[in-house]
Amino acid sequence: MAAISYDPPATLKAFADARGITFPLLSDPGSATIKAYRLLNEQATGKTAGIPHPGTFMLDARGVVTSRAFEASYQERATAGSLIGSTVKGETGSTETGQLTLKTTTSDLVVAPGARFAVFVDVAPKSRMHVYSPDQTTYIPVALEITPNEAIKVHAPRFPPSEEYLFKPLNERQRVYSRPFRIVNEVTVALTPAVRERARAADAMLTVNGSLRYQACDDKVCYQPVTVPLTWNVRLEPLAR
């Protein structure tokens, strides 16, 4: 990981030292590299003149760009962890029902106002069990719902591709998950004055609540729908200014 900015090396070093940043911060005098990649924000003036459009490039081990992600504004930015789909070491929860085991994790341990990070639900159906995917409209599909609150903006959840399953008792072909799968839901920390003030407090925390609703079936029986409450916790830090 590395970041590039038009700031001089001394400014970048002071910023990195103050924030505990260990990855390289690259100085781009005169925004030469930014201009070469056609990333210069030509509408930026005054103190912001020379800045690039906010974005992230993903490279493979050979240094080849494999994907990129750009933002509409500088204030709300996806975290590196959410872009690469990483899971932090701190597991925030584990739940088991009669049909599934669930683990809840996050892309980041620490977030700031404006950060767009991801919460994950890893779902493992038990032996012979399956749940219906969102594209199976004739039954109750698996659904993740994040509880809205004033500190976050909730984005749409993302589900992996499902598999086709033949339910022999009814001779029906259905779209299901019968193997472990992950649901990803991004949330953006609000930039409101209240949340910024809250982030300045020592040991400030942000709690995201939600629920997973599903109906599971085995090869013979469909069980009652279940709603499982879920919680994710991350530490909240103030913006660097």
PLM segments and residue spans:
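A short acidic, often aromatic-flanked loop/helix-cap motif at beta-alpha or helix-coil junctions
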Residues: 31-35, 164-165
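Solvent-exposed coil/turn segments that connect beta secondary-structure elements
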Residues: 7, 30-31, 62, 149, ...
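Structural microenvironment flanking redox-active thiols in thiol-disulfide oxidoreductases
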Residues: 1-24, 29-33
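Extracellular/lumen-exposed scaffold segments
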Residues: 81-241
